[in-house]
């Protein structure tokens, strides 16, 4: 059986390697590792012209919108909190277009951390711009439990209370249209959402690529492998 092609969005940042110092498409290695170990083929999707998103998504079997910078608050009608990071406008525009194309075409979609937040914003939802105590230390992945909502797509993948790797200071506030919560943290923070009106569209607030639990990515790969 042919393995499905899973596109993973990337940073576009200044980077230095060897004798070079220039802008580069950057993707932490755990992302393609997770796709590959879950049975898929991974390809990088650096920011591009938003009007090409639908054509690109049509060539993919599945889409992963990866973690990264805070979503610019203007995207959900808010002023920036002083604790919100600098915007990545080109990436916001590109990834919102990819999400809209995936939802319109029924392409299986997984949003990770920022990717979950963008899914919510794409559907008209809003974000909490800062949560105290959700980052243990700068650059250190923490862990906490998430509880699935019975009957949801996420619960079908991980039906029990699960300890997950996490690194975020923002979260979903008002849910976007057609989205339902599918997991919560112990403090009530929404930790997963899914689109009830899409064949397979899930967002998780944590970082599955930083752990060994393949179930969420395996779910995406299975959905991307299924015949249309």
Where are each of the predicted segments found?
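N-terminal beta1-alpha1 cap of cysteine-dependent amidohydrolase-like domains
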Residues: 1-112, 121, 128, 132-157, ...
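Hydrophobic, aromatic-enriched interface-forming segments
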Residues: 116-118
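Active-site-proximal beta-strand elements of phosphoester/diester hydrolases
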Residues: 202-206
